[in-house]
A protein has these predicted regions:
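Active-site beta3 strand of CheY-like receiver
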Residues: 49-55
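Two-component/phosphorelay signaling modules centered on CheY-like receiver
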Residues: 2, 14-34
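Helix N-cap/capping motif at the beta->alpha junctions
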Residues: 35-44, 65
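Receiver (REC) domain active-site loop signature in two-component systems and cognate sites
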Residues: 58-60
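A Lys-centered signature of the CheY-like receiver
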Residues: 102
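Conserved binding/recognition cores within well-folded domains
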Residues: 117-136
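Conserved sequence signature across two-component system core domains
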Residues: 10-11, 36, 54
Length: 136
């Protein structure tokens, strides 16, 4: 059975959440866990559920996406969603895997998701090797 990657979408815009949800539903190896309109609720979901990929908006009413990145202890693979490309450089410094510019494009979404999955797979393999070496 093929592994499914758990996805959380965080964006204060309903239409953005809806479109990204539709994109996620089209990809057979992705599973939508939840959508959140604010960072506070998203942090609760991240603490309660195993999230592999986080689609995170930069500008939200309660806590910005950038601040949320700083607050997260165990970070999933983060794909930033923004209308402002100038935030991307700072976001990469905080460990973001990729970013999507609004308005969203499905082909670009697939590229970002594949990059996130590759990052997760590489980290998983690296952890397995490290665990093996620790035993030896």
């Amino acid at each position: 059975m093929k592994r499914k990657f758990n996805v959380l979408i965080v964006d204060d815009e309903f239409l953005a959440r809806k479109l990204l949800s539709e994109y996620v539903s089209k990809v057979d190896f992705l599973q939508l866990i939840d959508t959140c309109s604010d960072a506070t609720k998203a942090m609760e979901v991240i603490n309660e559920e195993h999230i592999d990929i986080l689609l995170l908006d930069i500008q939200m009413p309660d806590i910005s996406g950038m601040e949320m990145l700083k607050l997260m202890n165990n970070k999933p693979a983060v794909i930033l969603t923004t209308a402002y490309s100038e935030y991307a450089v700072d976001a990469f410094a905080l460990g973001v895997v990729d970013y999507l510019l609004k308005p969203f494009d499905y082909a670009r979404f697939l590229q970002a998701v594949n990059k996130a999955v590759n990052t997760i797979s590489t980290e998983t393999q690296s952890d397995a090797v490290n665990d093996y070496l620790m035993v030896k």
